[in-house]
């Protein structure tokens, strides 16, 4: 698996994990929802970077992915095709 494929897999796992957790949450205000998503994303990123050294990415890139994941989830209601497009768009 080359680096591009590894990065694609990392992003896919990140977004799918966030999406899955988001579905399990109760309805909240946007602010509460965003704060919850931030904690979820921090946890998922921590798990990925601790257990998969090959996936260690620059912290700024991870923060950018957090923001993009939140935006996509809020704006597109968990649409799988949109999520797939987002993964392709984020990936280099």
From Swiss-Prot:
Keywords per UniProt: Host cytoplasm, Host mitochondrion
Subunit structure: Interacts with NSP2 and NSP5.
Keyword Transmembrane belongs to the record: no
Species per Swiss-Prot/TrEMBL record: Rotavirus A (isolate RVA/Monkey/South Africa/SA11-H96/1958/G3P5B[2]) (RV-A)
Family per similarity comment: Belongs to the rotavirus A NSP6 family.
GO cellular component, one term: host cell mitochondrion
Cytoplasm in keyword set: no
Compartment(s): Host cytoplasm; Host mitochondrion
A Pfam family reported for this protein in Swiss-Prot or TrEMBL: Rota_NS6
Name of the molecule in the record: Non-structural protein 6
């Amino acid at each position: 698996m080359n680096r591009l494929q590894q990065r694609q897999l990392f992003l896919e796992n990140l977004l799918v994990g966030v999406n899955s957790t988001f579905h399990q949450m109760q309805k909240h205000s946007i602010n509460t929802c965003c704060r919850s998503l931030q904690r979820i994303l921090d946890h998922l990123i921590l798990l990925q970077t601790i257990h998969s050294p090959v996936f260690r990415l620059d912290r700024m890139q991870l923060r950018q992915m957090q923001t993009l994941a939140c935006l996509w989830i809020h704006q597109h209601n968990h649409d799988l095709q949109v999520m797939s497009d987002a993964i392709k768009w984020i990936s280099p």
